[in-house]
A protein has these predicted regions:
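Short non-catalytic regulatory patches outside canonical folded cores
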Residues: 87-144, 163
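Short, hydrophobic, well-ordered secondary-structure elements
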Residues: 67-93
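Generic structural signal for well-ordered, non-membrane alpha-helices
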Residues: 46, 50-53, 80, 84, ...
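Charged alpha-helical initiation segments
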Residues: 1-72
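Generic structural signal for well-ordered, non-transmembrane alpha-helical segments
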Residues: 24, 28-31, 80, 147, ...
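Charge-enriched, short contiguous segments at helix-coil
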Residues: 133-189
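Surface-exposed polar/charged interaction patches
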Residues: 25, 29-36, 40-43, 47, ...
Length: 189
């Protein structure tokens, strides 16, 4: 049964809290920079070349776009972090042959996969999340609320070349943090 080797020296997992703290720090910097540029424009002071000739409204539009992009990238990062944590847990349960119901279900499903899929199992439909849901080790609503974040993650992470899912504009980083955190906290030990 192939299990991928995880190189702990080159892996760079991020916790949800690290991602949230990074996001808050960048938001603070954007707010400060926006205020500084707005003040400079009002005072007719020098501004960075990219802001020369901009009105306050154009500066607002610029920083609104930056914030929107930051939020989307943060959502991607939060969802991917939770996915990574669940995959590491999945491989640990399969490799260590634990006896709890989730581990047994994971192993049973893992054995049905091709060698290639055993190394990179599906995550959402027909994958790890479905096995997790079927074992009923947590409230399935928690899984469902996390799944609602996946379309945004895929759209941002895969180049945005198809129509924007409605969730992109409905989900903010705090909501996604709460959903991902609830999922990880509900995982059995």
């Amino acid at each position: 049964m192939p299990i991928p080797l995880i190189d702990r020296e080159t892996a760079e997992p991020q916790t949800l809290d690290e991602i949230r703290d990074w996001h808050h720090g960048i938001v603070d910097a954007l707010v400060e920079q926006r205020a500084s540029i707005q003040h400079a424009i009002r005072q007719s002071s020098a501004v960075a070349p990219r802001f020369v000739g901009m009105t306050e409204g154009e500066v607002d539009a610029h920083y609104d776009a930056d914030r929107r992009e930051l939020d989307r990238l943060t959502v991607l990062n939060l969802v991917a972090s939770a996915e990574g944590t669940l995959k590491v847990d999945y491989f640990r349960r399969v490799a260590e042959k634990l006896k709890d119901s989730l581990s047994v279900a994971y192993r049973k499903w893992h054995k049905t996969l091709s060698a290639k899929k055993q190394l990179r199992p599906d995550f959402d439909d027909g994958g790890i999340l479905d096995v997790l849901k079927k074992t009923q080790v947590m409230d399935n609503n928690i899984i469902g609320r996390y799944r609602e974040c996946l379309r945004t993650r895929h759209w941002v992470g895969h180049g945005r070349y198809w129509s924007k899912p409605v969730e992109v504009d409905r989900l903010d980083p705090d909501d996604v943090y709460d959903r991902a955190d609830a999922l990880l906290r509900a995982m059995p030990a």
